[in-house]
């Protein structure tokens, strides 16, 4: 990929979600790149979107475009995430970096900047769930971040997590079905509020029955691992995220909050096609200079059998 085309893509990605919105602990932006482009490379350049980069995903990206490699991988989760003290093939993260560099494939990660951005991942997650409640979706009376970003970006609706107050109450059972419908999942994990008593001890059918009687007028979402963020959504009846710790779940239940867990990346991956479409729209007349492909082999490592 030419440096001019790489800069054009990076500028478009910054327009979608400024990297300044990412957590201070995060590793975002252009993580792997050659200083010089491949001389024979010409448009269209190949852009591969994935939630995570395992070696299986990387190997697929190297032949996914009619046998040609990706010029740029946009990976929601960063690789590397933590600092690498050495680069050897024995380390999974350094193996990915070395292999990508050897094929002149750049790696970009937005991670928490996508989470916090207005119209970003958490807005997509909330809107999709609310829109999947019942036949025509549910009306929302109020909405916003669980934790507002500072400054001008906060005024524009940026921040961590998203919460919404429904115009009319629904049930936990309906929200469960809405989550499954939006994320195209066959199952999710559900933690009941303590008011449901010992229903959880009765197994799945008892939990389903109890969920029918749990009213929900206020819900909160956080993509990925949302325990620390959702703790601030104190008025919510239900928290929706990918994963939480055992003790976070117990504390939520004791506080009267139901929890729906999807597995970490299952509430993130569906946003990738949306990003591909938005990038194409931003690029306008120059969109034809790129080919976008969402990974067909990237998947959450956990499967419920």
Please state what every model-predicted region is:
Residues 1-305:
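Active-site catalytic microenvironments in core metabolic enzymes, especially phosphate/sugar-handling
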């Amino acid at each position: 990929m030419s440096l001019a085309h790489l800069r054009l893509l990076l500028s478009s990605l910054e327009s979608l979600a400024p990297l300044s919105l990412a957590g201070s602990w995060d590793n975002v932006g252009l993580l792997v790149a050659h200083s010089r482009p491949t001389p024979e490379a010409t448009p269209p350049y190949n852009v591969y979107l994935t939630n995570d980069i395992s070696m299986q995903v990387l190997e697929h990206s190297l032949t996914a475009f009619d046998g040609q490699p990706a010029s740029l991988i946009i990976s929601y989760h960063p690789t590397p995430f933590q600092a690498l003290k050495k680069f050897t093939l024995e380390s999974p993260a350094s193996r990915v970096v070395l292999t990508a560099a050897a094929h002149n494939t750049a790696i970009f990660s937005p991670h928490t900047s996508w989470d916090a951005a207005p119209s970003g991942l958490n807005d997509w997650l909330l809107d999709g769930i609310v829109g999947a409640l019942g036949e025509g979706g549910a009306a929302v009376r109020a909405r916003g971040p669980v934790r507002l970003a500072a400054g001008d970006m906060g005024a524009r609706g940026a921040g961590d997590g998203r919460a919404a107050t429904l115009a009319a109450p629904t049930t936990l059972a309906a929200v469960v079905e809405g989550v499954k419908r939006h994320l195209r999942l066959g199952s999710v994990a559900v933690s009941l509020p303590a008011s449901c008593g010992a229903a959880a001890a009765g197994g799945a059918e008892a939990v389903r029955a109890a969920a029918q009687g749990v009213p929900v007028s206020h819900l909160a979402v956080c993509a990925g691992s949302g325990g620390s963020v959702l703790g601030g959504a104190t008025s919510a009846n239900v928290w929706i995220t990918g994963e939480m710790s055992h003790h976070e779940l117990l504390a939520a239940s004791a506080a009267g909050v139901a929890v729906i867990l999807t597995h970490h990346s299952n509430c993130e991956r569906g946003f990738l096609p949306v990003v591909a479409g938005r990038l194409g729209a931003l690029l306008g007349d120059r969109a034809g200079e790129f080919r976008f492909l969402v990974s067909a082999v990237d998947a959450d490592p956990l499967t419920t059998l």
